[in-house]
Amino acid sequence: GYGEVGRILAEDLRAQGVAVAAWDLKLASPASAAPLHDHAGRQGVVLAASAADLAAGSDLVVSAVTASQAVPVAADCASAIRPGAFFLDFNSASPGAKQRAAALVDGAGGRYVEGAVMTSIPPYRIRVPLLLGGSSAARLAPLLNALGFDAKMASERLGVASATKMCRSVIIKGLEAM
């Protein structure tokens, strides 16, 4: 997605000279696409025609979409993902959705990694604390950190990173409510 999270990551990666492409459902509607085109033009981001086109040309796909779109986007990306390319799933989807997305991506030759964003992105931007999970997480963490991310390995098991995030959220929100 090329919403708030996607645009922030694109800005920070482009500031380092990293080539960035993006795709978003909103690109299908001229009215909602205009601000995305404006931002992409200012940042030097290439807008892809589809999620599959984006995946076909990428070594790393960061999926930051709504929970309802997590599996459909993973399926679209899996249809064209490069062998060995990473698919980093930032989505707040259910464990079952994460497992379905992982099966699609890994089954197509990609490397699915669960990414749990541990706090709000805007104040931290690319340095937001991330917990990674999955069998390819240990290989992706140093690559992300070299790009400026603050990524740490949680577990090779899918779901541990997201469960840790959920537990943290329950505690923090509970304390804030007191």
How does the language model describe each region?
Residues 168-178:
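Short, intrinsically disordered, charge-balanced linker/junction segments flanking boundaries
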Residues 17, 57-58, 84, 128, ...:
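Short, well-ordered alpha-helix to beta-strand connector turns
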Residues 93-170:
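Rossmann-fold dinucleotide-binding core
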Residues 51-112:
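Rossmann-fold NAD(P) dinucleotide-binding segment
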Residues 1-56, 152:
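NAD(P)+-binding Rossmann beta1-loop-alpha1 motif at the extreme N-terminus of oxidoreductases
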